[in-house]
C-alpha cells in the first residue's frame, strides 16, 4: 500500500510539473494572440510532441544517463568483461529509473490529440506516415544528443554538467525557437541540435518548408549517428578500469 501511495504521489507531482508548462502557455496567450506567428494550439502541439519524445526516450534509453555513474563505481567493467555487445548491455540492463514515464505519455498524447483536431493536422495516410517518421527521428536525435553528452564521462568522470546543460536547453525548446535571438536559434539547431526533438518536426507537420526541413532532419540524424559511433569507440579505447 505504501509503495502504491508513493507511486501515485510521484506521478501526480510529475503531472503537475508538466502541466506548469501548459499553464504558462495558457497565461501567455491570455495576453497575446500569437507568439511570433505561432498560435496557442501550435505551441501546445509542439510541447506535447516534445513530452511524447521524452517519454519514449525515458522508456527505452534512459540507461544512457547512468554511464557516468557506472564508470565511477566500477560497474562499467562488468559490461566490458561479458561476451556481449557493451552498448546493448547498457540499454538492456536494469533501468536507471524504475518508474515508467506514464505522466509524459498521458500529457503529451492528450495535448497532441486536442490540438491536432483543432489544427486539422492529420488529413490522410501521408500525414500519419510523416508523423511517425518525425517522431522516430526526433527520438533518435534526442537520444543521440544525450548519449554523446553522457559518453563524455570517459574523459570527464563527472559529466553531470553536460546533462544539466541539456536540461536547460529543454526549457528553451518548450517554446518555438523563433522567439529567441539568432545566436540561441543557431545553438539549438546546429551546435547542440535539440530543436530536432520538437520544433522542426512541428514546423514540418504544419507544412512550412517541409522538404528543406525534412532534408535537414535526415542529414542531422545521420551526422549525430556518426558522432555517436565515433565518440563511443574513442571513449571505449580511452576507458581505464577503476581497478587499473
What kind of region is each of these model predictions?
Residues 1-244:
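Hydrophobic transmembrane alpha-helices and immediately adjacent juxtamembrane helices
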